[in-house]
Amino acid sequence: MAFPGFGGNTQQLVIDASSSNLKVAVGTYNAKTGNVYLEKVGIVPLESDTISDGAITDQFGVVMALKHALAKLDITQKSTIVTVEGAFMHTRDLELPAVKPEQLKDMVKYEILGQSTNRDMIVEYIITGKTLDEETKGEKYKVRATAVPVDVATDYKELLKGADLQPYAMDVNPNAVRKLFSSGMINGSVNVSNSTLLLIELSSNTTTITVLDKGFPVLTRRMQFGHKNLRQVAENVKKTQGGGDKQSSLARRLNITKSDAETAIPVEEIDVWHESLADEPSLQSAANSYFKNLTDSVSRTAQFTINKYHIDSISSCFLYGSGAGYKKIDKELSRQLGTQVEVLHTMSTVQGPKNFIISEFVNCCGALIREN
């Protein structure tokens, strides 16, 4: 999905602007092999609420942070893809008559915007399959459509221009995830094409659960809770104990570009295994609250999807996002859910620089994939 108003090149800078930190990567997509190649990656911490639920609230602050980070990372690529996600997005699955492209486009817009009070929206769609009408036996398209307000797209376009970048395309994270996980092997052992999986993005303020059935996301749910409070409580505990005064190996590997962030407690030093929290009641309480929200959301989403879409039972869960770095989070979540849980470490379709941590750059990788 590429929204109009943006325009083209081969190697791209891609920015994931959906969370409290910007994720940036430079790379290419080879359509023949289906592989993504990343040359440089980095994370740009932002001041609190500079981007709120995917919407820019402090354009100047983001521009300054982005320009500083790109200079420090020695990224000179100008052609830029940005991928976003927020409550402003509206996505629907539709079944529409198999008509000509222009007619289908009008039908999709009517279905998406017909009941909306905001008609100033950009609407894009993909055809995900075909079916037959039960009554007429006529052919119908299965369509997934997404609408984003024009002013959101305009804000990001102006942001890129303010950072001396050239807008190329705009994507949305669910679409980026769809493209990235359409095929390939996860962690060297799970074939996406013949598995039913849960992908769980653990962000600071949100949690996104995607049910992936044989390479297609049948359902995506984004919840308004994240690991921010758990991180803050852990930092307070560590600082009380006199820790947190040196840059972590993870911060170096991720190329975090802000000196303030380099002194923060890295998540890989925060152990969330239940036995490790016995002597830290405040951290234990924060972890219990977070895992309760997480397990309840995962269980409800999985059960709803199995009942509604009649898919196979879910075989594995894979964690990505900033929260996937917590020590033993996969082990603890597996214990509570009673199913296999792994952190996303590798994908056969993605190659990155040395010590590349794919779990932080999933949306960037998917957004690099351009479909014509």
Locations of the language-model features?
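N-terminal phosphate-binding loop and adjacent alpha-helix
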Residues: K40-A71, D279, L283-A286, Y290, ...
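Active-site neighborhood for divalent-cation/phosphate handling
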Residues: S79, T83-M185, S348-V350
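Adenine-nucleotide phosphate-binding core of ATP-dependent small-molecule kinases
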Residues: N236-Q241, D245, S249-I314
